[in-house]
Amino acid sequence: MKPGELTPEGGAPKGYGVRLDLMARDAAKRFAERASHALLPEPSSVTSDYWDYARFRFAQRIASSCISVFATQQMLTAVGLGASRTLPAAAAVNWVLKDGLGRLGKLSVAANFGRAFDSDVKRFRFTSSVIYDASSFVEIITPYFPKHFLPLATAANIGKSVGITTANVVRAPIQRTFILEENLAEVAAKTSAQQVVADNIGLALAVGAARTMSKVASVRPEIRRALPVIAFGPLAVLDLVCIWKELKAVQLRTINKERAEIIAEMFVKEREIPTRARVADAERLFIPARLDKSNLPLTVTSLGEVCSTPKSLVNALKGSRNARPYILAYEPGTSKQRVVLDINTRDAPKRVATNITAKTRIKRKHKFPWQRKKTGLKGRALLALSESASSRDVLQAIIQVAHLRALPYRPDLTAEQAYVWALQESESLAKRDIDVFTKKLADRGWNAGRVLLNSAERAPYSVDNVPALIAALEAAVKNT
């Protein structure tokens, strides 16, 4: 039988089914290629961590879209059940007031946190999701309190405005991390396309669930109102888990205070700079930062807090004709107990074990020093930066704090002697390490040209004539 002839049974020509199968596969392949081109950037134009970020973001947007649909449904129900259910105009006024007052949240975020966003994009992004989900929950339970529609709806709308504004603001710094070919606009466009698809999937799922439950609600109306409340829990968990995974996948190249402390701690311990993936894994996405819970948390603050008395300021300025780039102090803890840190620090003085029992030693059960059980024994470190302080100076100060955490207890010294020795020893070690540290940072791909600090940490001091200031302070001390 020749090609194209009918089969003896009068069916389709031989090979017709094969051709249909090939056409279907070809069409599916073209569709997949077009979808990939529309939704995803070129693999060679983004970093490897982009794909985990995109995958978890897609799932998170689906969950978030479902939550939004259920929240809106409940808000409309609340308007219908409240005092305004017979007055459409009053319902409209309530809705407009809710939106208008909610914009105050957006204004508050833009006015008060502008500088802080750059220094902590991950923490702000995760916090924005927590606030958004909490606000959505307030909307979902509003039908159960119809007489309080306006205050509940306004509070929820303010929270959602804060969450949305924060998420939009920090999106660009995160997306900039992925680009390899100056293609930020492409990555932003593809991310928006992915968001539209995910939002529509979530919308379809939520509407389908609502329609299914509406049939059941014809028998028991209370079930329809309870569905969003029941669905909120798993959807919120999915939303937060996905955003957590999404942000953990992001490997920022910039250095802020927390990342600098993590890198410095690992460098002091291992003499190597950790990879960006390792630092991303060690970062915390919710307040407080990891090292804020260490045995010597670092606070970057004003000179007045670091040197609260004229005598302490004189001691800090002595030995230099020009203002120091930074001044570091620490407040010892109030406990009388002492702990020896079991860390091998090069050139550190020999540990003194006199009068120290085995119970007071910290066993190396954890990977990092700041993961040990908090003892509250060493107090806190205080750092003030001068207006001439460079990023190198900031990094040196943070390395000095890392060495401070690693220094052994000296029972042979008085409290004042131990204070002076600890600052001098840690400063010497930091000066020794800073060149190697900055070189290895660059080799690892970190952007060490600028250390990102928030507005509260940017309170630089300026001293024009150090000798004259010291003389005036010493005279003031004598007079008192």
Where does each model-flagged region fall?
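Hydrophobic transmembrane alpha-helices of Major Facilitator Superfamily
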Residues: 66, 104, 161-169
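Glycine-rich segments within core transmembrane alpha-helices of 12-TM secondary carriers
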Residues: 188-207
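Alpha-helical recognition domains of nuclear gene-regulatory proteins
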Residues: 140, 173-177, 240
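Alpha-helical transmembrane segments and their membrane-interface exit regions
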Residues: 158-164, 235-243
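Hydrophobic alpha-helical transmembrane segments of multi-pass membrane proteins
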Residues: 59, 155-162, 197
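Intracellular juxtamembrane helix-capping segments at the cytosolic ends
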Residues: 165-179
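Glycine-rich, hydrophobic membrane-spanning regions of integral membrane proteins that mediate transport
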Residues: 1-153, 186, 208-234, 241-480
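Short membrane-interface loop/juxtamembrane segments of multi-pass integral membrane proteins
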Residues: 175-190
